[in-house]
Amino acid sequence: FFLSALGSYYPEFLFFSKGDTSFALILAFNFYRIIGGIGVGLASAVCPMYIAEIAPSEIRGKLVSCNQFAIIFGMLVVYFVNYMIKDGMPDEVLVSDGWRYMFGSEAVPAALFGILLFLVPETPRYLAMTHQDDKAFSVLEKVNGTDKAKTILSEIKAVTSEKTEKLLTYGLTVIVVGILLSVFQQAIGINAVLYYAPRIFEKIGGGGDGMMQTVVMGVVNILFTLVAIFTVEKMGRKPLLIVGSIGMAVGAFCVAFCDEFQVGGILPVLSIIVYAAFFMMSWGPICWVLIAEIFPNTIRGKAVAIAVAFQWIFNYLVSSTFPAMYEFSPVFAYGLYGVICVLAALFVWKMVPETKGKTLEDMTRLWEKRAKEA
């Protein structure tokens, strides 16, 4: 992560002189961005899975949601960093050098992340599946206490005889549910809105600077992610996703309405903030919670990787198609996202199992039972 961030910041330091716009420089720049993308992809899959495997079941959802909070907090920091760079540089310097400072800032958290990983233990479920029971018990004891650690280790061993099993051992449904959770999280359009938030705010107005309004939205995102953290273990995963989907649909349809009837000022800005806020209290953190929880132990690694791969594929599709859709018709773009939000609510209601209060071994038994009944 550190090398990819540093390389993205200034690849021409390694190969070229400043200002060189050669094809080779473009290749070098994109090479380092790809390395960074691989790092982000790995982290996005492994982090929630790791938290779910090591956390006590009664606070697992809250802790996995904290992962999303950290991401949103990082995005808010980026908003502030970019705003300060934009505000503190002359335009001619901003165009040539502003992006270098933005990419360079990645190196600091990336280096800290890499260093701190040396202090993190392996998950007890992985250790148990690889027959390292003493190490698994040691980790469980530190997290849960001695008596509970014995019970949890016994449950893990009871449902796990092998390190891995074939992907479809528990049927196709669990894989489809995981994939569709990822697809809907992206297809509802949130990342397109976040990527292009400054330009959207500048275009629709609202009486202020587009970048500053983006910072305000970042603060809202953090506050509503906290709502998810403090309600996920009380309300459950499914109710939050359904409420969030409906709230997002309302926000998206309101933006479409404002554009269709030329309603300017603060209302369209508030509608986008409502749309983002409901995402942050639902699909933002809770999708990751469910992806980390629903899969049986022995296929979790492969299944999470597939689900996250679909997430990044649809992230790319949505973010790359949004500018053209928005230019063609904002009404169409936000209307489409609103419809997808409604479909997402129906999908969660009909197909997604509730994982609140269940151990990961309970989910293994659930899918094992469903596979036998199918």
Give each language-model segment a name.
Residues F1-K135, V139-E141, A158-A374:
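Alpha-helical transmembrane bundle of multi-pass membrane proteins
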Residues V143-G145:
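Short helix/loop segments within enzyme catalytic domains
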Residues A149-A158:
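Short, well-structured alpha-helical segments
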